[in-house]
Regions:
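N-terminal loops that bind phosphate or other acidic moieties
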Residues: 1-23, 27-251
């Protein structure tokens, strides 16, 4: 449960050096609380300021003060998923298990996040909405970047595809090999692999750690490492790749 012991505070220095920030694949689930702390928002427990708040501290925070808060960052933020912070199929429901959280952990954390958002909104009066799309990337960091700090959020997948002219290049190929650590329904929610699958018309093969989507017809065939991939990733990937090569040779 390391995700409950770290926060996003380290981002501040990096954000001051760039105009475009890519989000996704984070380990923390602090939805930007660490960053807000660095920007002057005080998270208080029993009258004492928590200097470097992490998710594990959330149950103890009873008030929020923004006397020295600096907001409105001029930053372009790219999100790797459309998933919302809270609500149905929230970021914690979808990505929490990948970050080591149990179902019980997730339910408790969602309640604490909702409570903290209420405290923050009471102090800042921003009419915050954690159910909006694109608010759940990077452990909910995009929620804070957009709705509290005023950053523009856009699809990272669409940005990447546009900048690389990748869709046009796909027209030159009859076979596509798509790789993902774990492919599930969330892979189709704004991620690059999902956007490419919408456009690619040829034979589509999955190669990766685990195929967990309910729809088994997304790919022509799929080759996965499975549970063994966690223990022996290199050998498992070699085996899966060799199986794929055999199929491609037959075709």
């Amino acid at each position: 449960k390391d995700s409950m012991l770290i926060n996003s505070g380290c981002l501040l220095e990096a954000m001051q050096k760039t105009e475009t920030l890519g989000t996704g694949g984070s380990k923390t689930v602090d939805f930007g609380i660490g960053l807000l702390s660095k920007l002057g928002i005080e998270f208080i427990s029993n009258g004492e300021i928590i200097l470097d708040p992490v998710p594990e501290n959330f149950p103890f925070i009873d008030s929020v003060k923004a006397t020295n808060f600096k907001s409105n960052l001029e930053l372009r933020v790219l999100s790797d998923t459309k998933t919302p912070l809270l609500g149905k199929d929230s970021a914690f429901d979808v990505f929490g298990p990948q970050k080591g959280l149990s179902k019980e952990d997730i339910e408790k954390h969602k309640l604490e996040v909702e409570r903290l958002i209420t405290l923050i909104d009471k102090e800042l009066v921003l009419n915050l909405n954690p159910n909006e799309i694109y608010s759940g990337a990077a452990g909910g960091l995009t929620f804070t970047l957009n709705q509290i700090l005023g950053c523009e959020i856009e699809s990272g997948a669409k940005y990447f595809i546009k900048e690389t002219n990748l869709i046009k290049q796909l027209e030159n190929y009859d076979i596509g090999i798509f790789c993902e650590g774990k492919f599930d329904e969330s892979s189709l929610e704004g991620k690059i692999i999902g956007e490419l699958l919408k456009e690619f018309k040829g034979h589509r093969y999955f190669l990766g750690g685990q195929y967990a989507a309910k729809n088994e017809n997304i790919f022509t065939d799929y080759f996965q490492c499975g549970p063994e991939g966690i223990k022996n990733p290199k050998s498992s990937l070699e085996i899966a790749t060799n199986e794929l090569i055999k199929v491609l040779k037959k075709d």
